Amino acid sequence: MYFQLTGTHVRLLGSMHLFSAASPRTPAWVVQAFDWAEALVFESDAQAILPFLKREGGQSLEHALPPEVWRRLDASWPSAGVLAPLGELRPWAAMMAAPTLCQRVVEGVEPRMLREAATQAKPYWYLETAEEVVASLESIPLSAICTGLELLLADLTEPQRTLERMQAAWLRRDLQSIYDVAAESPIFSLAGIRSAILDGRNCAWAPRVREALGTPKRTLVVVGALHLCGEGNLIERLQYPVEQIPFCD
């Protein structure tokens, strides 16, 4: 979960973007990783993606989804805020947001680190632009999005269960267990979604991380833990030796 790229000043940390509200504390090894770093690298700027959640004109999302999926989503969708109205969202935005409406969560690693980086004047940058994130998400086939939403609506308790199990594995720093939990998640099992969210982005990120390997600054690269496990993970794509960093009490 926390790796040193051998012979460099770069480390790699697998994060959780959201924590269960029942387990909100940042673990000590994550705090230690932040304290070690003189500079940080994150996936992307979440705030910069918000303007892309909605379409500019065109047909309502209602016309892209199966009638029953639309009916059930629309009945429980927030009536205000960045996700409203449902009809204006891009299909991938509805798919990404829908599970969080079934979860009891608090912010995860990245927002906390970003605030602390600003407080301590630590520099940071991103592995991808908002436009690149959106291009990846736009590549998800509509059929996969519809299937993912149907699977979600078939068991609205699954997102919270999966989050809690994944966070428990993450707190143990057990990458294999994280992957095993994710593999049981219906959405993760859909190749079109997995490829866009994980595989393709890992491919794009690897050369950008490699470019940073010569930095004299202690640099911490923070990506979602799922990017570090399974076939085609970021460590594999880097083609560079890494060492697990032991946790010091």
Language-model region placement:
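A short, acidic, amphipathic alpha-helical segment used as a generic capping/interface helix at domain edges
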Residues: 197-217
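C-terminal structured interaction module
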Residues: 210, 218-249
